[in-house]
Amino acid sequence: MKFILPLFTSLPVALAWLPGIDKDIYSAAGTNIFNVTSASSKRWLPASKKIRGVNLGSHFVIEPWMASMAWSNMGCSGQRSEFDCVMALGQETADQAFADHWGSWITQDDINQMVQYGLNTIRIPVGYWLKEDLVYADSEHFPKGGIGYLEDVCGWASDAGMYIIIDLHGAPGAQQPKQPFTGQYAPNPGFYQDYQYDRALEFLEWMTTSIHQNNKFRNVGMLEIVNEPVQNADQASSMINSYYPSAFTRIRNTESSLGITSNNYLHIQMMNEKWGSGDPTQSLTDNYFAAYDDHRYVKWDSSVAVDKESYISASCVDDRGGNWPTIVGEWSLSVPDNVEHTADWEPSSNTDFYARWFAAQAIAYEKQEGWVFWSWKAQLGDYRWSYKDAVDAGVIPKDLDSIYDYSPC
């Protein structure tokens, strides 16, 4: 998905901006958290200054499985998605409930703690319904008022010197069936139609304009045009051949109309070919500004034997290359559901294993452009999905460079 010194020495000069390459980014206090040596050196140093980030999961697109207490406190118990909750509560009550959630799930203290833990990037999942005039008032039900809270989070992260990826996590019509991460529990994916692509493209234009014109978005350098589409190349063919190139054209035309110079363009991110939706570059005429997202959940890889040494070994040799540049934008320490609570895998008594496995995965993903863990926090009582809890448990070190001292491989 994005950035490292070789990326910028081998490509043409007109490039999307990346921190420490095209321009440095600083916290409000003047600190450059990507550069620990000097202001003039390149940011991405092997084993030190790759992308190291966390997802703000369940902030703007709530997934009830990982935020059950918050979901219940909002009055949404028993509802499967944001769409269902808003429909059940009614618009006015839902808007207040969601505003309370947005104001408390991720705070400025969280952002500051991320920096203290050595993180330099956040990925923010959002839904198309942030642009409220895209929502069909007679048939769609989503909370209103989220954009101001997105501005706040991006402002805090920019003030802290962090890099920001905004990800279209919930697409019009839903890009996957029966998945709350789309914002609705649709029986079938309705995204793969021209009129839905048009709505998504309008969202991307609006988001691009907001990023370039609102100072709180100043450290947003990447816009992902859809998260986790269907893993079926035939079903996704119109997305690859129509929506992707149209997204590039519409985003670049928007930037040109705003007078944005090429070194300040956004990176445009797509799921990589490993995801299974097809080759994202197939119909692109210019991919110099492209970046790629890889989601690596070993727990769902049936080719890896379910024992600790196999998990470590698989991660040690895990090559996430292919489309380039790639960031591993989602991963975790979770293991298969049928063993996750057994003695061999129970979190509290196996911290040494999970620390080794975290190191093995992070080192592998830093052979690409870095990683973004899913997620910063969860309400599962299980650090395998919660970066914050894993640090508290001693599984993830605050000094992330020390993972190379673990020698897990």
From Swiss-Prot:
Cellular localisation: Secreted
Xref: InterPro entries: Glyco_hydro_5, Glycoside_hydrolase_SF, Glycosyl_hydrolase_5
Keyword Cytoplasm belongs to the record: no
GO cellular component: extracellular region
Pfam families with a match to the protein in the record: Cellulase (PF00150)
GO biological process: one example: cell wall organization
Entry annotation: catalytic residues: E228, E330
Coiled coil (UniProt feature): none
Glycan attachment residues as annotated in the record: N35
Endpoints of the signal sequence: 1-16
Catalytic reaction list: Random hydrolysis of (1->6)-linkages in (1->6)-beta-D-glucans
Gene3D superfamilies per record: Glycosidases (3.20.20.80)
UniProt keyword annotations, A-Z: Carbohydrate metabolism, Cell wall biogenesis/degradation, Glycoprotein, Glycosidase, Hydrolase, Polysaccharide degradation, Secreted, Signal
Record-listed E.C. numbers: 3.2.1.75
Origin superkingdom: Eukaryota
GO molecular function, one term: glucan endo-1,6-beta-glucosidase activity
SUPFAM superfamilies reported in the protein's UniProt record: (Trans)glycosidases (SSF51445)
Annotated family: Belongs to the glycosyl hydrolase 5 (cellulase A) family.
Known role: Beta-glucanases participate in the metabolism of beta-glucan, the main structural component of the cell wall. Acts on lutean, pustulan and 1,6-oligo-beta-D-glucosides.
Protein name as annotated: Glucan endo-1,6-beta-glucosidase B
Organism per entry: Emericella nidulans (strain FGSC A4 / ATCC 38163 / CBS 112.46 / NRRL 194 / M139)
Lineage: Eukaryota, Fungi, Dikarya, Ascomycota, Pezizomycotina
